């Protein structure tokens, strides 16, 4: 039990480190800024799509009220009034204004995908037609699916089985959980569809549940803070709603991005527990696997490394690929696979050590045993090198910097 608790604490620390390393707070700030300008265009597009189907007529206002009632703290009521007014006015824009709104909505989706791709360490974002079709599907089919789901929900809640004396036991509790279920579905879809990477549905669902629960807790705590500490109203007066709403948007994006970090690292949850090896040793091990597959005429992907015993997480694999591609060791073979495109017989280890951006490991960091045929001679060579370095440079700085002259000579 204690071991599981310690593992959970270590994994939480690992996620927090990745959250900061991936610059998620900066991405949340950028998304907050984009959301401020894109919320009205997104709502306008949603209303326009729903108005195309007579059965969904008037559904947009109901959905908007539902969203603000269940996903925004009570301090957002004034903002809801303003947004409704802005959205109503936006429906009377000319085609130039409509194009501007569409571009603004697309900009928000681009910013979201960029933040997610940075978390997933995606080397190649979506381009061209693929990106356009995804965004268009979100802007067109998204509101229609939302409207259909809301219509079905409205019908279900009107049944006598959920209201009145004939209501089923626990029906009221079930209805109260519907906003949470909507949140889980939305976050699951977001985590599975937006990153340009393969995301297991199970991991996306786990992240959706985690983010939805954390979102509900944050909404409750944020509402308590606003009601118990109204000092911001004394400072901002009539404009107090605006900074509070911006703060909530920023907090919401922080939660969403932390959920993305969780989903990304669920697939490597068993890898973070391993004792980290020096990057230079990992690099040599990866080159060894590349060399073996080159001799067999085969390409390489991350799963092949895992089978060979090198349990690299996605971000470390991408970091190594950046160096290997820059040094023209490997080339892309398509389908996420890579091939060795350099003759290792014409490339010395000394040259690699000079070009490698990672330092040579000390004796303390060198693993005592490694199930690789090349490792024992490499370990012995590294130990001899460090002994010779200590013999050459082991004297004190005072010895090296002492001189008997008054000035330095440059030759």
Swiss-Prot record:
Pfam families: Virul_fac_BrkB (PF03631). It is found in: Cell inner membrane. The keyword Cell membrane applies. The keyword Nuclease does not apply. It is a multi-pass membrane protein. The chain crosses the membrane at residues 36-56, 92-112, 132-152, 174-194, 207-229, 244-264. GO terms for cellular component: plasma membrane. It comes from the Bacteria. Keywords: Cell inner membrane, Cell membrane, Membrane, Transmembrane, Transmembrane helix. Belongs to the UPF0761 family. This is UPF0761 membrane protein PA14_51960. It comes from Pseudomonas aeruginosa (strain UCBPP-PA14).
